[in-house]
Amino acid sequence: MYADTLVLDVDGVLVDVAGSYRRAVVESVERVYGETIAQPAIQQFKDAGGFNNDWELTDAAALFVLARREGLRMDVDEFTDRVRDLGGGLDAAKEVVGDLPRVAQARVRDQWDRDALRETFQALYLGAELYRELEGGEPPIEADGYIHDEPTLVDPETIADLTARFDVGVLTGRPAAEADIALERVGLDVPEDRRFTMDDWEEGKPHPRALVELAERFDAERVAFAGDTLDDVRTARNADETDETRVYYGIGVLTGGLTGEAGREKFANAGADAVVEDVNELVELLE
């Protein structure tokens, strides 16, 4: 596959977040509401689309838990399938809750505390010390921080090879400060004008704006975007349809929630141009 520019996702591509972000989703809902979803269900929300932002995924998981309490007769499979059919994301999750009677809907809304969920999530993920530094206040709970439990997935030799041969950018749903920590951990130096984080755009994946803008900044002709979710591949597909002046490739990486042959099939169905076992295989795939 020929490309002159490579754009990388962070979570599930450069660092393993199964024990950090995904754990924080599950435990935030548990701490706020006393029950939660199973961690494998997070991938079902991701596959439904529109959940690049893990705070919003946490909000949607909480909605599911609260709606079930109020009589919503759906399991997580049915709930996420319906979310997907409605276009994905938090707005779709809220629409599913609209199946409840009005009084039950009102009770769900009254109990749904997005601020408490976000503060709990950040305290669990960052830990008390980083929470005080980055959030500017006292954490609601004392924790060591799951951010310290993120094994790297990319070899130093891969970073050296890819940055020597390609213009390299980053497109991630992380806040900028948390992206800095992950990029420093893997040894990837990406200037601010060559990356998009949660702080830089509102639309989120799979909207193509950020990827197209990165391509413009690089003056690229052929852009490969590697990510671990279906929305990453959809972002590349949407960019290819939107920007007629360039070619965009979507590459699925099997070190996130999608793995094995089932993961390959899902990526292929989403329009992936290639699927790799891990980010290190990009060295051989790209030329």
Feature names for model-found ranges:
Residues M1-G50, E56-D59, L63-R68:
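Active-site neighborhood of HAD-like aspartate-dependent phosphohydrolases
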Residues L14, V168, F225:
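Conserved SAM-binding loop
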Residues V25, L134-I141, G145-E184, M198:
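Substrate-recognition element of Asp-dependent hydrolases with the DxDx(T/V) motif
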Residues L171-A224, T229-E241, Y248:
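Substrate-recognition "cap/lid" segment bordering the active-site pocket of phosphatases
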Residues F225-A274:
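Acidic, Mg2+-coordinating phosphoryl-transfer loop and its flanking beta/alpha structural elements
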